[in-house]
């Protein structure tokens, strides 16, 4: 080969070598970036650009696999104390837990086999709904617990009804500040049957299902250890099993709402071959869920807790043990009749318990779907809102199951309940509305619904009427007490809020077996005309304000607006309902 040709070949090879190195560098950078994203943000690859998880295309489960190289221990006093729920506008941030090294004695305990009933009588009592607890000299042993980075879930647009009159949290029902209560940690004393672990069908399933856009739920059958002090739920694997699962769950159905979930205790659900010794055996399933969040507002009491809890726990017919994180005593007292109907056992305060509870069946989190509804195609036993409506009527011993046709009762007048409000979205001409309704044949009842209302009394009032009406707000949640075929009329304030109103109360009412009417007010019926000129964009193009986010919508169209109903315009709605009641 000639020297000239050899030189050209060398230059060509050098160029190709540089290109190859550049290609390798680019590919390497891409792989490093992808690896970082997968490890640090496992959810990021599963959601579309607007941050919402598609209900139809969501994965069946999101598994976070990690190997545990070192045990650590979290002290119980590092968890935030359970407080009454507060609906807030600023994220207060959760305190970080402090990790401590695991002693040799604890390592020995973790690998030991449980001795049935050994520590049952000697276990320390904690605070649970029921009665005064007695303290013993033995403290429950804590599980070795590894701190992992929090799994950040995608932001989901969670619409919340936060009425001014429904945010008086931190109070008992009688308006007194919270007091310190002590409760007996004695879920089902005397249950000494050790859980069985042989369940091949459940062994094949992932422990948790993250596919639901609103709630993450973990369900296990077998040998399960719940250790509140370590905020952990352990599924005991056979020695031959190679499965390793670790999940991080906040058991409150507002998935993606970081403001709300910032106040919820995170629970680690994992498979394990070693665990702390059982100090308490239970023969009934466990359901673990949180209270702090948006509870304290009537709408969120139901859509975030009571409806999901009914969906999750009804199948057990009272034979179920509730373990509540972020306990709010005043709230559990308010809904004590509901808890008593769903469970025969005292509530366990998860954040103030030091025992190791052993179950054969456990559910962490609550089954939840769209706002204030049940998806019967996905719910256990195909439960529906008709079932929930029936459950609430029976729980509060309400007499009317169905609305009776007016023609069957001589001279009977249909009863109309008007939900009044005293702060925002008030009826400015309430007396005129009452007079008009009475003129066309209604017997009118006016009641105010707020956080301090006696739910038992209010439920009886609601159940006694044929029609309930009110401006969009949490008070309309009381429709759960209406008899079948009763009518709910929702007055929608100005501001393009028809779709929100339909989702929050229209769809749920119809799914409960109620008739539903929606009346959207006109510009002349809004008090906003006293604040803005008629040619203002708030009247000519109200939907343009929605781009500023829900907080702006709430402040502008809900908190600063009252309603002066045009009785001539609204009268045909009441007449139409009257005709339906006569059929």
Swiss-Prot record:
The lineage of its organism: Eukaryota, Viridiplantae, Streptophyta, Embryophyta, Tracheophyta. Residues 73-178 are annotated as: Disordered. Belongs to the glycosyltransferase 61 family. One of its GO terms (molecular function) is glycosyltransferase activity. The gene is XAT2. This is Alpha-1,3-arabinosyltransferase XAT2. Residues 149-160 have a biased composition (Polar residues). The chain crosses the membrane at residues 22-42. It comes from Oryza sativa subsp. japonica. Residues 43-583 are lumenal. Glycosyltransferase involved in the arabinosylation of xylan, the major hemicellulose (non-cellulosic component) of primary and secondary walls of angiosperms. Possesses alpha-1,3-arabinosyltransferase activity, transferring an arabinofuranose residue to the xylan backbone. GO terms for biological process: plant-type cell wall organization. Pfam families: Glyco_transf_61. Residues 1-21 are cytoplasmic. It comes from the Eukaryota. Its EC number is 2.4.2.-. Residues 102-121, 135-146, 162-178 have a biased composition (Basic and acidic residues). One of its GO terms (cellular component) is Golgi membrane. InterPro entries: Glyco_transf_61_cat, Glycosyltransferase_61.
